[in-house]
């Protein structure tokens, strides 16, 4: 009897701990946080109830430390949600629990005075280009995958989650995170890629310099000098000592990993959508060629 009572109490307190680990924000989303060894991972479910069992749709946001919500001084709070508001997300939540993970060391809700013109979180409003040091050190691809893995492991154990399907999608930098998640997590059933660069990140800067020279916006000599500087920066990103003195190099190294090598190894249905005037995703036009070479038919694309 004592063993039964003890088991009941443990389950009871565990349930209380989980139920008190979230709150509703702006009557739009439920905020959870997971305490890790050296990090606290905040994420939201874009809904106000969890009474319907649905699969997970994880949306991986783009670059920079954007908060999930902004609180203006004299107006109603509004949701950025990692850019999910650019999509018809209300349609998504009809069939899925839509999840967005906050950027590392970035508050979920930030007052308007602490966001710069690009809506990035800045702790000191007088220094609009200076981000939190911890964020800069945490801003690399493998860390985003690690954080997402922790969130997905937590969600798989929840009674309101249908584990028969797992959709992972990402925009811009988030497409790189989504790719790595799908590449390493066999439970992912569908992958969505929006405004993605199949060859990483740094190559788009080099291509942009060439285009600028072609349009005579800069000289070919200037383009060559700029390209050489990018080569040097990328070389520096592989130098551990230089990365320690300049943590920004970590992001350039990790996010410049060519994605196309991963995409053609991923077996699940993959949806690729991109704009026609986007330097980052210019080379998406040749992605179908790689799938054809491999005899793969799991790619759907939209330009």
Give each language-model segment a name.
Residues 20-55:
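N-terminal cap/lid segment of alpha/beta-hydrolase-fold proteins
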Residues 119-129, 134, 192-265:
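Accessory cap/linker subdomain of secreted extracellular hydrolases
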Residues 151-210:
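Primarily recognizes the serine-hydrolase "nucleophile elbow" in alpha/beta-hydrolase
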Residues 266, 272-274:
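Short beta-strand/loop motif that positions the catalytic acidic residue
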Residues 279-286:
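Conserved alpha/beta-hydrolase "acid-adjacent" motif
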Residues 293-303:
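Catalytic histidine neighborhood in serine/cysteine hydrolases
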């Amino acid at each position: 009897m004592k063993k039964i009572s003890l088991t009941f109490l443990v389950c009871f307190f565990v349930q209380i701990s989980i139920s008190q680990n979230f709150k509703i924000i702006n009557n739009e989303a439920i905020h959870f946080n997971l305490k890790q060894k050296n990090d606290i991972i905040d994420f939201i479910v874009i809904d106000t109830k969890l009474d319907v069992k649905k699969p997970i749709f994880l949306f991986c946001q783009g670059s920079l430390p954007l908060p999930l919500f902004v609180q203006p001084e004299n107006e109603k709070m509004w949701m950025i949600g990692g850019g999910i508001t650019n999509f018809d997300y209300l349609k998504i939540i009809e069939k899925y629990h839509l999840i967005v993970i906050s950027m590392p060391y970035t508050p979920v809700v930030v007052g308007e005075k602490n966001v710069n013109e690009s809506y990035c979180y800045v702790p000191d409003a007088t220094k609009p280009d200076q981000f939190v040091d911890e964020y800069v050190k945490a801003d690399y691809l493998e860390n985003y995958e690690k954080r997402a893995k922790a969130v997905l492991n937590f969600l798989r154990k929840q009674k309101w989650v249908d584990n028969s399907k797992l959709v992972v999608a990402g925009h811009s930098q988030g497409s790189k995170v989504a790719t790595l998640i799908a590449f390493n997590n066999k439970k992912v059933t569908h992958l969505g890629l929006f405004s993605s660069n199949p060859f990483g990140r740094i190559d788009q800067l080099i291509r942009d310099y060439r285009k600028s020279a072609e349009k005579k916006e800069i000289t070919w000599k200037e383009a060559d000098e700029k390209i050489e500087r990018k080569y040097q920066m990328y070389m520096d990103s592989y130098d551990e000592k230089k990365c320690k003195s300049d943590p920004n190099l970590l992001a350039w190294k990790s996010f410049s990993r060519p994605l196309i090598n991963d995409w053609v190894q991923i077996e699940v249905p993959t949806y690729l959508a991109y704009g026609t005037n986007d330097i980052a995703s210019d080379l998406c036009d040749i992605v179908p060629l790689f799938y054809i070479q491999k005899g793969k038919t799991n790619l759907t694309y939209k330009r």
